[in-house]
Amino acid sequence: MATLQQQKIRIRLKAFDRRLLDTSCDKIVDTANRTNAAAVGPIPLPTKRKIYCVLRSPHVDKDSREHFETRTHRRIIDIYQPSSKTIDALMKLDLPAGVDIEVKL
């Protein structure tokens, strides 16, 4: 039996600031719900931690080091049965610059 493949938009969001990421996710889900599309998410993915070890002194003291870390928070939102209104509303949506957005159809 042949089944019809459902149309789906997958939106991946990445940010260093968790609160900024969550507000962006809320805006996307609200926009999808206003245009009668079914939004699933935001689904939290594991946070990536990158730790940098730096010498404190420019000269001799190798024992004295300092650690810095960056945390990359990630979320996925799936939008099922998107209409042209949904796509237009998502294109016009104003999101902060600190959030990286990747869209797949």
UniProtKB/Swiss-Prot annotation:
Family: Belongs to the universal ribosomal protein uS10 family.
GO CC, alphabetical: small ribosomal subunit
Assembly mode: Part of the 30S ribosomal subunit.
Top-level taxonomy: Bacteria, Bacillati, Cyanobacteriota, Cyanophyceae, Synechococcales
Protein name: Small ribosomal subunit protein uS10
Pfam family, one: Ribosomal_S10
Molecular function (Gene Ontology), one example: structural constituent of ribosome
Keyword annotations: Ribonucleoprotein, Ribosomal protein
PROSITE patterns: RIBOSOMAL_S10
InterPro entries given in the database record: Ribosomal_uS10 (IPR001848), Ribosomal_uS10_CS (IPR018268), Ribosomal_uS10_dom (IPR027486), Ribosomal_uS10_dom_sf (IPR036838)
Gene label: rpsJ
Function: Involved in the binding of tRNA to the ribosomes.
Transmembrane segments: none
